[in-house]
Structure formats: structure tokens, C-alpha cells
Amino acid sequence: MQEHTKSSTLENAIALQKYGVGQPVRRKEDDTLVRGKGRYTDDFNLPGQAYAVVVRSTHAHGIIRSIGIDAAKALPGVLGVWTGKDLDAAGYGPFTCGLPLKSRDGSPLLQTNRQPLATDKVRFVGDPVAFVVAETLAQARDAAEAVELDIEPLPAVTDPEEAAKPGAPQLYDHIPNNVALDYHYGDMDKVNAAFASAAHVTKVDIENTRVAVVSMEPRVGLASYDKKTERYTLQVPTQGVAGNRANLAKNLKVPNEKVRILTANVGGSFGMKNINYPEYMCILYAAKTLGRPVKWLDERSTAFLSDSHGRAQKIHAELALDAEGHFLAAKLEGYGNLGAYITGVAPGPLSLNTGKNFSSVYRTPLMGVDIKVVLTNTTLMGAYRGAGRPEANYYMERLIDRAADEMGINRLTLRKRNFIKPNQIPFAASSGVTYDSGDFQAVFNKALEISDHENFAKRKKDSKKAGKLRGIAVGSYLEVTAPPSPELGKIVFEPDGSVQLITGTLDYGQGHATPFAQVLSAQLGVPFESIKLVQGDSDIVHSGNGTGGSRSITASGQAIVGAAKLVIEKGKRAAAHMLEASEADIEFEGGNFTIAGTDRSIDIMELAKRLHDGKTPEGVPDSLDVDHTSEPIASAFPNGCHVAEVEIDPETGVVQIVRYSAVNDFGTVINPLLVAGQLHGGVVQGIGQALMEHIRYDESGQPITGSLMDYALPRAEDVPNMTVGDHPVPATTNPLGSKGCGEAGCAGSLSTVVNAVLDALSEYGIKHIDMPLTSERVWRAIQDAKGKAA
């Protein structure tokens, strides 16, 4: 045993050098996915399955007079056609929002209580009104086209500001002026007094455009029902099976244990797949009614109508400063567009999250937020990468650049003057949260260094010689990650020598299996290769809060660390028995349980094997397995500074990002390779919104960007080379010191890219262009400026 232990100790030390915390280990799943061996939801089929197609409204607003289904039911292969009345009779629904948000008068968020299928009115183009199930997908499509809808059109409203005005079309009788939430934060008397005494006030009106999630695999559902056990099973892409099971069980009016959620490879989500949708209720109903599995798969064209969108705010922002440029107070006023229904966490990003993140890394003594969250005749809103954080940082950074220009203060100087200093941390921000860590000035300085900011003037001259405009922008960001919540941490030692790790978050592209294994390996000394992350089955992942809000490494990390401590406690009792020693004399280090002061030890994997192989007396654990739920931990505060340089062709308005740099503080980085991937992806997603992405509707509520022919996405040629640095200051809010990184790229890139374009256009006197800064918008702004000059 002693020789074995020495060998294993050396092996553990070598393994930690390769696979330990901080090492750039490649993702465990890469080989499978790169070779096309991943299994997405549409890859799953069940014997005897039928196919569903949803019938949707082509009107943005209207009264349902009748739904004719007889012709559709008579077509070959059709197994059933159902409307909202059928699902209402079954008692399904409604979909609600669980956030405890309140309006300024203390009243709760007004719910829309969405049913799976509309029965009285349709409220947006794409609103589900019926569904068809047939033997084949083609037959189901034919039958869906045969359903006859008689809808009396009503006036529609798509703009949240217009929707909140008296006399606007009303979506719900119980929600006056379509305002579901009149959100307020801050002491406005103090805020207004600060503005009244300010030497300078900067104001800017900003429209944060509506964007769509264009996931690699659209939404898909495969439903079945076991009559004997009265149990529903749904194969579906999600961001967390436990939470989705609970929500679905609530909608189905059954106990949680009567629902099983299965999730394999997700194919992208960015917040969109984290809620339950009407289509899932429809196929579960059909599976139970027909006694056979039913599959529904979305198409790209209908995904633009049915999937939740993101952003969509109209904001008036103000910043009050003294004569030296010190911030005195800041205000946000405006509207958030909820779309036609409220589900998931949609009101949060539009209100609470925007407010919590607005003060960013700056000393802003006072802050006021007034945002009306409004219903319109458009596709429902949801969380979208960052969920309020990129929006808030965008408003602050736009204000700072504008204030610097108006006051004649260098933009860099103004930022430096207002940074929260390290000796002021912990810092109680005016947004209501307390920052536990960070060195924002150091991050800023490093970003200037790696971007070669000091030589920008030379590069600008070179661009001018080539007939191009060149601009630069430097922007900081800070994110308040997801609110405190408990998380599952379960560890199972299998007889074959593998170690199952189970936690309530879910990997839908982040690569959790690798950093989670790195953390567990470091805690217990178990071989990295032996650790298998088990996820995507609510029968196994019985609790947990899913992936979202950049919480996975902090919440699951804490749960893993907590579970590992319990394993060590059990291991000490078992090792004391095996080594015939007192439990008090057992020490644990590097994967070995050792009798203190001796060389008698047993490796943790050997101990687990022996416990499997034999019986243990009373009081001695029969395994090292643990099932642990961690206590909620406070939010973390990832932050950073991005620098973007752009060139613009003034003859065409085409914008090219020619240099991009970012320095980030993600606290303790578990795997820098994965962090870089998350950062790059987030930056590109932000570039997409800044320069090209925009969901638009005409005045009647008809979408005019309903396909990839109309909705532009970044391509490889749009992605700049990135120079990335880091300046980690470990968080004090979790045992790993991590801060989360999944949404940081978006938070930094929106403002930086837009401000860089406006800097390039400053010689024309152009102060503002709303996103997206397409070549057409930039070209028109230049032409308008030339016309005014003439």
C-alpha cells in the first residue's frame, strides 16, 4: 500500500500540473462534436412517433371568430387537430413569470397568464392557435394549411412608448395602457437635487435594438406519455432540466415526479431555450391523448416568430457632473418592450438587471431608474446573452463619451477620474449591490497598453492617407451575475473506477465537463480522465438552477467544493477503519488518506474500490458517494476594459473593425482556454448587434426581418483578431474566487464598437447613431452631415 501511495502521489502531482485549476485543458467533448458525433434533440426518435405542426396567426392583433378544423381532420394520415379549448379543458397552463417584481406603487407585476394556444385573441404574428398531429411531417404540414382561421383584425402597436400612451391598442383588459410593470429604483428627490446642482448634465436618447437568437439547432421537442405510471417525458433543449421540469409540472398540474426532462446537446441557447413554450405543452397533450410519441421541430422561418427575442429598450439617459468631471448622479428613464406575453424572466433584464448594472465601475453617488415594461403586438421577450448587463454598460459608456466631448475633457481622463479605487472596495454602489473585489484602473491601464493606444494617432494618419476614417474607443464594463441561489453537487464513485459528477447547471456550449473536472480533481486528487459529468436527465439531476447569468462556475464550483469536503469527511471515517486508526489521526492531501506522522496511507480511488468490494461495519460509510446542495452565494462582479479600432469607407459607409483588445478580471480562472472561447464568442455577438442585427416590424405588426435573408449575422470576415489580457482579482464571494465569464464579451463590445464608429465620424460632427450601425445608416449620416455643412 505504501509503494502504491507514493506512486499515486507523484502521478497526482503530475496530473495537477496538466489538468489542475488554471491549466488550458481542451474540452472533453470537442472530439465528439468536431467529428459530428454529437446528439442534438432532432437526432432522437421513438418507435411509432407521430409529427406535430403548429398553426399560427398571420395577424398581429385580432379577435378569433372561429377555427375550422374539419377539413384538416379529414386529410390522410391526420391523427388529430386541437385548439386552445381542448388544452383549456385539460387544465393545462397558464405560463407566468415568477420574478417578484413590483411597480413603484408596490403592486406586483401584472401577469398575462398565457395559455398554450390562443382562444379569444391573437396578439402577435406567430401566435399559436391550433396544432395538427399526423403520421408524417408532410401530412401534418398539409393538414396545418387546411385549418381555416377567421380572425377579425384589430389595430396593433409595436413600439413600447406608443403602446403606453392613452388610446393605444390594448392587448389585455386588465393591464391599463399595456404597462405590466412601472419599475422604479432610487431616491429621486436626492437624484434630482444632484442634477439641479450639477455644473454639467449630459443627455442621450438611445434605442437598444431588438435582436433574435439564431441557435445552431432550432427548438425541438419529443414527447411521450406512460399510461401505467401516468408520467410525461419530454426530450427538449434546455438550460437546466430541474427548473424546466418544475415549471412544466406546474403547467401540466401534476407533481414534479410525474415529469421527466431529457436534454442532450443543445445547439446554442443564449437564454432563449430556458423557458417552456406552448409547443411543448401541445405535444405532451397529444402524446397522452394518442398514446404514442409526438415530435415537433421548429424551422428557421418560424423560429424568428416563436422564439423569445432580446434587448428592445428605448432609453433616455442622463449623467450629472461637477465642474471637474466627477460624477454626481445618473438617471435612466424609458421603456422596455415585453412583446405580447410575459413568461420566464423577461421583465427582469428590461428593468431590474438594467438598473443593477448601470453604475458599472464608476463612483456614481446617486442613481435613479424609471422604466415602464410594456406589452406590444410583437414576439415575446426573454433573456438574451447578458440579460440587462450589456444594455446598462452601453448606456453608461455612451454617456461618458458624450460628456467628455461636451466638457472638453479627455475621454480617458474622465474615466480615470471616476473609477472606484481598490482601497474603496468593498464598495456599496448606488445600484444597490456591494462590489467585493476589483482593480478597475489597473485593468484599464493594461487595456491601453496591449492595444497600443498611444500610437493610435499615427494609425489614424495612415488610414486617412488611404481614404479611410479611423476611430478608437475604450470602454469598461462590470456585470452583476445571477442572484444568489442554491446548487446541486453530487459525486458518485462507480465500480469501474469512474467518478460521476452531477450538478444542476447544464452545458449548452460552455464546456462544463472540463473545468468542473479540473475543480474536482484538484479538490480530491481523483484522476481528471476518470471524471464524467452527468447532466440532462431530471431523474438524476433532481434539483438545481440551471445555467444562466454567468453563474455556472461560481454556483456549481461552490457545490463541487462543498461535495468534495463531504467526500473527504466520509473518506476519513472509512480510511480510519481500513488503516485501523483513529479518525482524528487521518489526514487528507493530494488524493491520499494518511495516518498523521506515518507513511501508512490509502489512495482515495483505492478506498472507493474497497468500499464497493466489501461490507463495512456500522458507523463506517459503505461508499464515498455524496448528494449535496450548497447554500446560496452572493453575486460575483466580472469586469474588464475593451478597446476597439475601426476604419470606415466614407464613400460606402462600410465599417471594418481593424483592431480589438480586451483585458478582463474574471477572478480565479479555472481554464483560460475555455474563457478565451467564451470571451471571443461574446464579443462577436456584441459586434453583431452593434453593426448588423435588428428585428423590425411594420406599423401593422408584420415582421419584416423574418429570415436570414433579412436578418444579418456576423460572418468570419466580420470577426477581428483579438488581443486578450487578464488582470484577475479573486472574488471573495465563493470558494474558488471565480467571477463568471460567459456574457462578458457582449457587455464590453456593444459600447466599444459603437463609440469607436462615432469617434471616426466625429470630424463630420456626428454625435449619435442608433444600433445597428449598418453601412447604410453610416453612409446616410455622413451625407446628412455634409448637407448641413453645405
Which residues are covered by each model-predicted region?
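Glycine-rich loop/linker segments at domain edges
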Residues: 23, 29-32, 98, 104-112, ...
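Conserved catalytic cysteine-centered active-site region
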Residues: 119-122, 255-263, 286-299, 303
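C-terminal catalytic domains of large/alpha subunits in multi-subunit enzymes
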Residues: 75, 85, 99, 107, ...
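Conserved beta-alpha junction segments in alpha/beta enzyme cores
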Residues: 191-252, 345, 352, 471-503, ...
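Short acidic, glycine/serine/threonine-rich loops at helix termini
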Residues: 92-96, 143-146, 236, 245-247, ...
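Thiamine diphosphate
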Residues: 269-291, 295-297, 512-520
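Flexible, low-hydrophobicity surface segments
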Residues: 1-180, 619
